[in-house]
Regions:
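Loop-centered beta-sheet repeat module
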Residues: 147-184, 188-193
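N-terminal hydrophobic targeting/anchoring segments and the immediately downstream early-domain regions
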Residues: 1-134, 138-152, 199, 206-329
Length: 329
């Protein structure tokens, strides 16, 4: 929707060209109080409306994969994932193989669609494998632009998620509730699409992770997906030369910062948010489509990262999370 988002970075040919075999497919609806006509998405005013909206999102993924099984596939368990990766390996190693589908693991961004914590089990049965409790603040916890701790309901939500073996996503959670979650949650924790706050000069919102939180995430063997969005790399990018002044060096700096904090490459990956309401006009100048993420590899090599390091960052870290936390079958 160019009038809102700019020109898209995504398309099936670009997924294939960029060797993007697995993505987190996001369920998302906006709270009406924050919309103001800005976002071309469904909005809600109550938990019941949020539930309906998120369920419609999920149904859309099921229709997509049912109607186009050669192009998109839901990955619900380790058996699905293993079979899917084997197909991708065959394709990468033999160009004569037909292009495989893109695998989708469903992630709920903002838990307002969960009307009460006990309902998590129903969403799990429907195919949701990861939940980020916040987008903005809600009855479960503080979120972006709306700070606050975990509520009693939020703690119960985390307990229900842990019982099911779900992955907790702390992206968009407030600093306080994210750190609480890292202390309390008994399952796997990630930050699917967050950057290091310390590298974003003068950022006025609580959207990204402080180094203290990144250290906690590393201690919990979590993974943090770096977002190549200009405003999340330089808050004042429009004043500093616009898109043409933004380069992949900003992305590399974010990746390297997490690696330096960790002392290794096991805790950082890519979390593009390219389905998140922005287009090519808002990303570094070397990126025209998602396929251009491959340009990050030689830049990492130039900085001294070896082949194993780069494999961790591009695929193995996220795959470790999925292989360790998806149900067996």
């Amino acid at each position: 929707i160019p009038a809102f988002n700019g020109n898209t970075l995504l398309g099936l040919p670009q997924y294939i060209e960029g060797r993007v075999g697995v993505v987190f497919g996001t369920l998302y609806c906006a709270p009406k109080r924050l919309d103001k006509g800005k976002y071309p998405v469904r909005v809600y005013e109550s938990p019941q409306e949020a539930h309906r909206c998120y369920r419609e999102n999920l149904d859309a993924y099921h229709r997509l994969t049912d109607d186009h099984p050669d192009e998109f596939r839901l990955l619900l368990n380790r058996t699905d994932l293993s079979s899917h990766l084997s197909q991708w390996d065959a394709f990468i190693n033999n160009s004569r193989e037909a292009a495989p589908p893109v695998g989708i693991v469903v992630l709920m961004e903002g838990a307002e669609g969960v009307r009460e914590p006990a309902e998590v089990e129903q969403w799990y049965e429907w195919g949701v494998r990861l939940i980020g409790p916040a987008w903005a603040g809600n009855r479960y916890c503080g979120g972006t632009r709306e700070p606050g701790p975990l509520s009693k309901e939020g703690i119960e939500l985390l307990e229900r998620m842990a019982d099911l073996g779900m992955v907790l996503d702390i992206s968009h959670m407030d600093h306080q509730s994210a750190r609480q979650s890292l202390d309390l949650y008994q399952g796997q924790v990630i930050a699917s699409h967050s950057n290091a706050e310390t590298l974003i000069q003068d950022i006025p919102i609580n959207r990204h992770l402080q180094d203290e939180t990144i250290h906690q995430l590393i201690e919990r063997d979590g993974v943090m997906g770096i977002v190549p969005l200009n405003a999340f790399l330089d808050w004042h990018w429009r004043d500093h030369g616009g898109r043409e002044a933004m380069s992949l060096d900003h992305v590399i700096a974010q990746i390297d910062h997490v690696c330096q904090l960790a002392g290794n490459t096991r805790h950082v990956a890519l979390g593009t948010d390219f389905d998140g309401g922005f287009g090519v006009e808002s990303v570094p100048s070397e990126i025209d489509t998602i396929a251009d993420l491959q340009k990050i590899e030689p830049r990492l090599s130039e900085k001294g990262y070896n082949e194993e390091d780069i494999t961790h960052i591009f695929s193995e870290n996220w795959l470790r999370i999925l292989e360790n936390n998806l149900p067996a079958s």
